[in-house]
UniProtKB/Swiss-Prot annotation:
The modification Phosphoserine is found at residues 86, 585. It comes from Schizosaccharomyces pombe (strain 972 / ATCC 24843). Residues 221-234, 499-508 have a biased composition (Basic residues). Its EC number is 2.7.-.-. GO terms for molecular function: inositol-1,4,5,6-tetrakisphosphate 3-kinase activity; inositol-1,4,5-trisphosphate 3-kinase activity. This is Uncharacterized inositol polyphosphate kinase C970.08. Residues 14-23, 205-218, 608-622 have a biased composition (Basic and acidic residues). Residues 60-72, 162-187, 382-394 have a biased composition (Polar residues). The lineage of its organism: Eukaryota, Fungi, Dikarya, Ascomycota, Taphrinomycotina. The keyword Cytoplasm applies.
Length: 967
């Protein structure tokens, strides 16, 4: 009896699980009030109360009616029902029909009227003898009872099991019915129904509807079934196994939408219970948790109003260093405009250099992001330049003071991500369907310099050749990719339950990535590099300035001493009022001069190669009046903007309509802030827009079409390195002695060489680009931008800058706040990274950066536990791969205009920077430990404090190759 199958009988108050012996005689008695003589339990029990017919689900009604299908069921198989009126206490069975009467249509009419009876009648069940089914069906049920999920077992409580020892086997009827049939006469209800005035309809038609609804009702109820706590009862003296249905109402309904992964821990089935169907019926299948892909009707992608097909990217707050705008894609992922072949660098690392994976952010894929541009503003806007010299009369504040950013937030665009534009990044099982869509599949073009194969980009055309390997998506971090996509495109109600509203998603954590957001007052001609943000500025209160497209007087900025600005006229109208400029960063700039290799995106949105992606250069920038009289923040990034007069042409706006919004939808006009002016009067209020719709809808439609153009831009999606940190502290350092790529022009080469010579890059192989540090005792952040780093000199200044990142302040004379416990981990990881880079013969990490990250919030102390909570280990990651190249990319190296001087060796400038960091951190650690020992009076034991790190500094100090600046 221990291994006997179980029949779960759920109930809203109690439940049973009744064991029956494998092919052995046994009678199972379903007990409700713990009394074994309660075999005549009906639904009129006082503990339950009467149950009206309209309260029964279609599934239960179909269980009664499906058993009497005249096409598959014999007359002896008709179940018996006891019908009484709801307002009556009588439970006397009605008259039983004779076998002759079963041949008439009255019995079928009774069943049909039974469905239409509504609340006038209630149902009571009595213990009934069970039809003997075939041995095959019995064996299948026994096997399923052992392995079935609890939800499947709960659904089997609707069946009436039988003994396999009976002699009256009717294989044909039992195996072709969806549920086990019951052999008993049916009480006629036609007379009482006719007396009550209930309408009567054709029995055969209604029976067909009931039977057709059976599978649908079972599938609809499958996700809601729950099994109650079982109790075992047995009676060893019976020859048959019986079970009586006990009413069951689930106490808690599960969600109708469950975005599941393939490795979910529970089953997702189209039909919870096993179906025994006739040969004419279509067999139903189920998919278990071990399946490689979910079913076609997976609830994750029932695209309705609950599932967003377009999501808006939110700004990623307070980047550290740089000025490329980062956006938050989810809680665990961020994205930025794709520059050159940066994504192929990640994909090459995954395929060829997995040893670098611990030192790079987890790569997720490439997104096609939609930008909407208001074309009327291009013609109406007037370019107003701000003279930087006029605002530079007051000396800039000292680099250790912090000023707030007073500029008005003016976002030039808000990018949006749609499912239709990004089918390539979704796993196949996540897509709504696997056929060719009306929008078409993206055309695949072979990537010239990468072995990633063919890849999809824009899903607005029909694919000529299916992609062989996924382009623009990770091959390793698949689990993270699916978690991020599930989070972003989860149902709206699910996001509300989780307490995360996607459109209001924001993080209290500052960003680790580069920030062009710095505060500055009036500038001084002699010192334009000492700028910082106010320590009182709460990073949680405002959006990042990094996505502001402030506009400035380009000619005045170029005239400024020691400032270098790249300029490129994007679209030159006939008048000078519509001028638009494009800016580039040296970290993510295109260097290939072959303009014919960068096709324009036409109205058909023709595909273009990832190398031809112009990154953030797609943005059309316009000047805006500066009401505060200060220099917009674009001008202070001039040093990172490299000269390159031969740049790829911009992407032409694709004149396509928004497939997810109607023309008259006012949200379409207001989907993005205006780019031309900061004046709010130029914007169209929603109320005015609605009035225009009421007055002249056609005119508004034409106006909307003429005002908007859509551009597609590629964004790279990577892991959010600050995920899980309460107060991330970040240091961004530019690595290497060479900051220009292999496709740089002579002008760019000269500019970057001069820049490295003026900073610590040439001498140390590293320069500081920015940092943010959280001080727990002050409950505030301190920030330093890249211009502070450019003024730092090698020696004590560089060492003090690293100490400030570890928590030291000006008033911390005894280094009590210095987090020296991070230094051993830093040195260990820098040594590991150096060993990896030394093995990358022929590869170059030009203009890449290292990010140092740790959580500035100390871990909570658990007073109840004796063990001290260990803080999170500091992390080191490489970012900015736009100008990097691997030795495997033979084709690109062959076309290089500025190839590496030592092609067969490693990146010596990068190794020099790693060695510099190790030496400086080691010196900080020794001085901090020495000071602590000296204060305690143990100067003689000072050398013992160095034993912890002495073994780590095992590299050769006479490596002359690290002294060469030309790599």
């Amino acid at each position: 009896m221990q291994n006997a199958p179980k029949c779960y009988l759920p109930n809203s108050r109690k439940g049973r699980d009744v064991n029956f012996h494998d092919r052995g005689p046994e009678t199972l008695k379903c007990l409700y009030d713990e009394s074994e003589d309660n075999n005549n339990f009906t639904m009129h029990s006082e503990s339950i109360g009467p149950k009206s017919l309209d309260s029964l689900s279609p599934r239960r009604l179909s269980n009664y009616s499906s058993a009497v299908d005249p096409r598959t069921t014999s007359l002896e198989d008709v179940p018996r029902l006891i019908l009484t009126r709801s307002n009556s206490q009588e439970q006397t069975p009605l008259r039983t029909h004779t076998p002759v009467e079963y041949m008439s249509d009255s019995i079928h009419k009774s069943l049909a009227d039974l469905q239409l009876g509504g609340s006038s009648y209630s149902v009571a069940e009595s213990p009934v003898p069970v039809l003997q089914s075939s041995a095959v069906s019995e064996a299948d049920d026994m096997a399923s009872a052992h392995s079935a999920h609890p939800s499947r077992k709960a659904s089997r409580s609707l069946r009436l099991f039988e003994s396999s020892t009976s002699n009256n086997l009717e294989t044909g009827n039992s195996t072709n019915t969806a549920l086990h049939n019951v052999s008993s006469p049916l009480e006629s209800v036609s007379e009482r129904l006719s007396k009550s005035g209930s309408p009567s309809v054709g029995a055969q038609h209604d029976l067909d509807e009931v039977i057709s609804e059976k599978d649908t009702s079972l599938s609809r109820r499958s996700s809601r079934g729950r099994s109650s706590a079982p109790k075992r009862r047995k009676d060893s003296g019976s020859s048959k196994t019986t079970a009586t249905y006990i009413p069951h109402n689930p106490s808690k309904k599960s969600s109708q939408h469950l975005p599941l992964l393939p490795d979910a821990s529970f089953e997702l089935e189209r039909s919870v219970s096993r179906s025994y169907q006739s040969p004419a019926s279509t067999p139903r299948s189920s998919v278990s948790s071990v399946s490689s892909s979910p079913p076609e009707d997976h609830p994750f992608f029932h695209w309705n109003v609950d599932y967003p097909v377009t999501v808006r990217l939110e700004p990623f707050k307070h980047q550290v260093g740089g000025h490329t705008a980062f956006f938050r894609f989810s809680k665990r992922a961020v994205c930025k405009p794709l520059t050159r072949n940066e994504n192929t660098f990640y994909e090459t690392i995954e395929a060829c250099h997995p040893e670098l994976l611990p030192f790079i952010p987890k790569y997720i894929g490439v997104l096609n992001v939609t930008h909407t541009i208001t074309k009327t503003e291009e013609n109406d806007s007037t370019t107003e330049y701000v003279n930087t010299e006029s605002s530079s009369k007051t000396p800039a504040p000292h680099k250790h003071t912090f000023n707030s950013c007073y500029q008005k937030k003016d976002y030039g665009y808000i990018p949006e991500v749609s499912v239709e534009q990004n089918r390539h990044i979704f796993p196949e099982w996540m897509l709504p369907d696997k056929r060719s869509h009306s929008y078409g599949s993206p055309k695949s073009l072979h990537h010239k310099s990468s072995s990633a194969g063919e890849r999809p980009v824009s899903p607005t055309f029909v694919a000529d050749i299916p992609p062989k390997t996924p382009w623009g998506t990770t091959l390793i971090n698949r689990k993270l990719r699916e978690e991020v996509l599930r989070e972003v495109f989860a149902p709206k109600h699910a996001r509300r339950r989780l307490g995360t509203r996607f459109h209001s998603r924001s993080s209290h954590r500052p960003s680790v990535f580069r920030d062009n957001s710095v505060a500055f007052g009036q500038l001084d001609n002699g010192n334009t590099s000492s700028r910082a943000r106010d320590k009182d500025a709460d990073p949680n209160k405002s959006l990042s300035c990094s996505v502001e497209d402030k506009h400035y007087d380009l000619h005045s900025a170029v005239a400024e001493e020691n400032e270098e600005v790249d300029e490129e006229l994007l679209n030159v109208p006939s008048n000078n009022q519509g001028k638009s400029y494009r800016r580039f960063s040296s970290d993510a700039v295109w260097e290939e001069p072959e303009s014919n290799e960068f096709p324009r995106v036409s109205g058909t949105m023709e595909d273009y190669d990832s190398r031809e992606s112009t990154g953030h250069t797609i943005k059309e920038l316009r000047s805006t009046p500066n009401s505060h009289g200060t220099v917009p923040d674009d001008s202070i990034f001039a040093m990172d903007n490299e000269e390159n007069s031969e740049l790829p042409p911009p992407l032409e706006p694709a004149e396509i309509g928004d497939p997810f919004r109607s023309v008259n939808d006012p949200r379409r006009v207001l989907s993005l802030p205006h780019m031309a002016s900061a004046d709010e009067d130029h914007r169209i209020p929603a109320s005015d827009n609605q009035n225009n719709n009421n007055n002249d809808a056609n005119a508004l439609a034409e106006n909307s079409e003429s005002q908007h153009s859509t551009q597609i831009e590629r964004y790279i999606v990577i892991e959010d390195l600050t995920s899980g940190m309460k107060r991330p502290c970040v240091l961004d350092v530019k690595m290497g002695t060479r900051q220009y790529g292999i496709m740089a022009t002579e002008k760019k080469k000269a500019s970057q060489t001069k820049k490295c010579a003026m900073t610590t890059s040439r001498v140390l192989g590293v320069r500081i680009c920015g940092m943010q540090v959280w001080h727990p005792w002050l409950q505030s952040y301190t920030f330093e931008d890249k211009y502070v780093g450019r003024d730092i000199k090698a020696g004590e200044e560089f060492q003090h800058a690293l100490m400030r990142y570890l928590g030291k302040t000006d008033d911390d004379e005894d280094n009590s706040h210095l987090l020296v416990h991070h230094i051993p981990t830093i040195i260990r990881k820098l040594e590991q990274l150096e060993q990896i880079v030394r093995f990358l013969k022929g590869s170059r990490l030009y203009a890449s950066s290292l990010l140092f990250l740790y959580d500035g919030e100390p871990p909570p102390s658990d007073k109840s536990s004796k063990e001290k909570v260990k803080p999170r280990e500091i992390d080191i990651r490489i970012v900015d791969f736009a100008n990097c190249v691997f030795a495997e990319d033979k084709e690109l190296l062959a076309k290089a205009t500025c190839p590496p001087q030592h092609k067969d060796t490693y990146d010596r400038g990068y190794v020099r920077g790693l060695r510099t960091l190790r030496l400086y951190f080691l010196k900080i650690w020794k001085e901090a430990k020495g000071m602590q020992i000296a204060e305690r009076g143990y100067e003689d034991s000072l050398s013992n404090a160095y034993d912890e790190l002495g073994g780590l500094m095992s590299y050769s100090n006479d490596d002359d190759s690290c002294g060469e600046t030309s790599t």
